[in-house]
Amino acid sequence: MSKDKVLTAPGATIGIPRSQRHYGMDWLRIAAFGLLIVYHVAMVFAPWAWVIKTSHAYPQLIAPMALLTPWRLPLLFAVSGYASRKLFDRAGGAAVFARSRAVRLLVPLGFGMAAVVPVEMWVRVMETGYPHGYLHFWALDYWRVGSFYGREFPSWEHLWFVAYLAAYSLLLAAALAWRGAQIIEMLGRAAEWLGQGPRLLWVPLVALVTARLALLFVAPERQGLVSDWGGHSQYVPLFLFGFALAGAPRLWPAIARSWKPALGVVALAGVVIVAIELRYPGTAVPPHALMALDRAARVAMAWGMILALFHIAETWWNRDHDWRKPLAEAVFPFYIVHHPAIVLIAWYSLPLDLPPFAEFALLLGGTALVCSAVYLVGRRIGWLRPLIGLASKPVAIAPAAAQGGAAFERDGEVAALVGLDAAHRGAADDAAAMDPREARA
């Protein structure tokens, strides 16, 4: 019998060994991040507000990008929750889990705000008339607090996702330290109940839509850890769903039953979203009834896509490959660097007035090259590894998890960071990138 500890949710039919890794979730993260880079490069050309724009907007991008926007971030928080449960099970307690999350999330966040985000903020203020070079900006102006050349300082820009994930993880760790057994049991029973019949598709969908609409005209739609109640009303439940799923294997058959009707929901919601987006493009604000319909459709699409993509990850992608581990490890460094890379390359290349396909290829290829260089160099420098989200050294493993668990401990924490979008609204500030209906970035 394996020495691995087996964690079983109430009502589960099989146990989950602590060393077990879901390769499908890794591939899902990797694919989502690849999509993220393409999406953010396309934002330079889309007719929506963003950090830096080409002089020629392309309305043809509205429909495909409108179909991507609603589900990228929710997917990432759900996958993050799943990976966080695996890490918690291996940590041996809430305190170790909290310490691990703080180091692996807050250190890169601090480094990113000090050394990576300033590049993007310099381009932002240059766009509004700032007269000095980057070194002058970083040394004398970046550290101010308040409004400066129309931008708010300080800012974590695209790293807002890391801040949110750190907050959710540390709050969850505190709750688990307080009532861990009760919370795990409650999540397990909720998962067991949702796994019956068609509940998994419809109950969360109705709950998420209700929460979103309840806050729509009450809380402003804006990025901010203490003000983004609309975002938290979606991200927190999905993070907890992923956390529960990792300990409740009985949910996987329910996902398998739900994915086809979920795609039907996605298709219907997509028609609504695109129709409203085309009718009220850019900063145009639709009537309240249509705005509520748009928000409900976005939430429905997000939940449907999560179920469908989780089924794909479980059924077709849950297998290992030589490329999986290096790609999964590269996710977080790529996430930290990719956004400022796009902005800086665009800042210097747009005046060349290249043909659109050449410009797109330059932005995409240049961003991939910069991210790859940072990852390949940074992973070889010991003191730089934790700053770009990599483990400084292999994590010590509890005896109960020693057999078979080492592979997860070395690269599993990077997986929980979901450094992809992973999608996100934070790439632009509240004024420049926030559409009245939803952030685009």
PLM features: residue spans?
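Alpha-helical transmembrane segments and their immediate juxtamembrane cytosolic regions
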Residues: 2-419, 424, 433-441
